[in-house]
Regions:
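N-terminal intrinsically disordered, cationic/polar leader segments
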Residues: 1-216, 220-307
Length: 307
């Protein structure tokens, strides 16, 4: 045979599921985008077209919605674990399941002063507004014996309006950038972190608390680091997470440097004391790195888009 089959997988991508949990008059929302990828004994469907080992992708879609009812959605990670375990243990030909989930965050809408007196609460218990552009993500991979859980976020935009410098860099005949001793530092964070929970015998992390605390440490490190380079800030963000979250062994960030350039106001007879900037959307510097707990091996892909 002149050709052979290489790596392959199949499943149903981007199953949008919204789960409403009703606690009396108070409602809670989980809004997920779930993608299922299955692999295993799938040679014949490629070579001969035999579907004998194929679980239809429509069935994987139906499973996502059924599990939202049967198991609920405590967290994106826990929901993905339920799905991955089911596909591997219930279908003999399937040896590995990879579940990717994006979670969209919602927060309650505050009631007006007059209405809060009427309903006896500061928030409307069934009304929500989508929170910014930040998206929570997770990927769960299960091969029947071990787990890999990589979680994170994307599109979290942050800015320091001072306490950032950039100087002392290499200069050649093409360098025009002026050294900066007080600049805006802004980025759109894409980050992933890998948990050291890999076995059912281990104690499972509290996924919701872990995400909340990891995000907190990441933002605090960004805010509290007097930055001489975005690389330095990135390293401090990852180190803060690993030093404070024992369940995480590896962090990877991709941070575009959202450049803000001082506008020359002298033609208008005005002085610009680091107050008026032009926000450039492209081109941008792109800073990427992995931070590891000492003694651990890197496993998060270098290109986060390949997760």
């Amino acid at each position: 045979m002149p050709t052979i089959l290489g790596q392959n997988q199949y499943g149903k991508a981007e199953n949008r599921v919204v789960k409403i949990t009703r606690d009396g008059a108070t409602h809670h929302i989980k809004d997920l985008n779930v993608s299922v990828a299955l692999s295993g004994d799938m040679d014949e469907v490629h070579y001969s077209g035999s579907n004998a080992n194929v679980l239809p992708t429509d069935t994987t879609k139906n499973t996502v919605y059924a599990f939202a009812k049967e198991h609920g959605i405590e967290s994106a990670e826990q929901f993905g674990i339920h799905l991955a375990r089911h596909f591997v243990t219930s279908q003999e030909p399937i040896r590995t399941a990879r579940i990717r989930i994006e979670e969209y965050q919602w927060e309650r809408i505050s009631a007006s002063d007059a209405n809060s007196q009427f309903i006896g609460a500061d928030e409307v218990k069934h009304s929500f507004v989508r929170k910014g552009q930040e998206t929570r993500v997770t990927q769960i991979t299960y091969d029947g014996s071990s787990w890999e859980v990589i979680s994170g976020l994307k599109d979290l935009v942050v800015m320091n309006s001072t306490n950032s410098e950039f100087w002392g860099y290499v200069k050649d005949k093409y360098t025009t950038l002026q050294e900066a001793y007080d600049r805006i530092l802004a980025t759109q964070v894409s980050g992933r972190w890998r948990f050291n929970w890999t076995d059912d015998e281990q104690r499972m992390p509290n996924w919701e608390k872990s995400y909340e605390q990891t995000r907190k440490h990441m933002l605090q490190a960004f805010a509290e680091t007097y930055s001489l380079s975005l690389q330095q800030t990135l390293y401090q963000m990852g180190s803060r997470i690993i030093n404070n979250r024992s369940e995480i062994d590896e962090v990877r960030f991709s941070l575009p440097n959202k450049h803000h350039f001082l506008v020359d106001l002298e033609p208008f007879g005005l002085k610009n004391d680091n107050e008026v900037y032009f926000a450039a959307d492209r081109p941008y510097g792109l800073i990427e790195a992995t931070i590891l707990r000492d003694g651990c091996e890197p496993k998060i892909p270098v290109d986060l888009t390949n997760l």
